[in-house]
A protein has these predicted regions:
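Active-site C-terminal subdomain of aminotransferase-like
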Residues: 18-19, 195-240
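Active-site phosphate-binding strand-loop segment of PLP-dependent enzymes
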Residues: 119-176, 189, 197
Length: 240
């Protein structure tokens, strides 16, 4: 008998994180049919409780995707080709915002800070003022996994409001571990993932979007399907 079978490994990575035993036990059960009443009941209960995790009164959109999928959904719904978008990065996943914005054709201003340093909200504000026209959104990271730095999301939200633009925050590795009261701070979009501090299996990604962000997405003429927020919100309400 292979002794490796009985070795218990403990993950010390930023994600995926270790699963609580009761979660692992459920994962060993037979797969459920996603249209069955029992599954729908669990799904609806999860959707009902997710806003508490994000500290918001808004619905949380759920996708079968990696965290990067939910990040792409934010860019697909909010960025417009040729229109300004500002990215503030200080690590690998901040850079991903810039790559996404450029892929969708946004006129991207990428403010790159030294890895290991925090994003400077004042410089973000100066960059917005220098654009000469409103930015569609600021894209930033709460907890930069590549360095461990926690950015000042509250200050970035104040900058966004002062310049009448949206703030989109990747909180994939911080959500559930670092406080981020979305509604209280006025953060328009918070992106989350199941496999980090929430300690559940990989495969789910979330976008908690404010009414202002959803309105901006509804007016965006860009093409999208799976990551279309309006379609996803409608599906969650009407046919889970």
């Amino acid at each position: 008998m292979n002794p490796e079978i009985f070795n218990k490994q403990y993950l010390m990575t930023a994600g995926p994180t270790p699963l609580p035993p009761r979660v692992s036990q459920v994962m060993a059960e037979p797969i459920a049919y996603h249209r069955a009443p029992a599954f729908v009941e669990v799904y609806e209960r999860a959707l009902e409780r997710l806003p508490k995790v994000f500290q918001t009164a808004n619905d949380v959109l759920s996708f079968a995707a990696s965290g990067s999928g939910a990040m792409e959904s934010a860019v697909a719904n909010l960025a417009v080709p040729g229109e300004p978008a500002v990215v503030a990065s200080a690590g690998k996943f901040g850079q991903r915002w810039a790559e996404l914005c450029e892929a969708f054709g946004a006129d991207t201003t990428h403010l790159e800070f030294e890895w290991g340093e925090k994003v400077d909200p004042e410089r973000v504000g100066e960059s917005l003022a220098a654009l000469g026209r409103p930015a569609r959104a600021i894209f930033a990271t709460q907890s930069e996994t590549s360095t461990g730095v926690i950015n000042d999301v509250r200050a970035l939200a104040e900058v966004a409001r002062a310049h009448n633009t949206l703030l989109v925050v990747d909180a994939i590795s911080g959500l559930g571990a670092v406080d981020l009261p979305q509604d209280e701070w006025g953060v328009d979009v918070v992106i989350g993932g199941s496999q980090k501090s929430l300690m559940t299996p990989p495969g789910l990604a979330f976008a908690a979007a404010s009414e202002r962000a959803l309105a901006a997405a509804a007016e965006n003429p860009g093409r999208r399907y799976y990551f279309d927020w309006s379609r996803t919100a409608k599906g969650q309400r009407e046919q889970p």
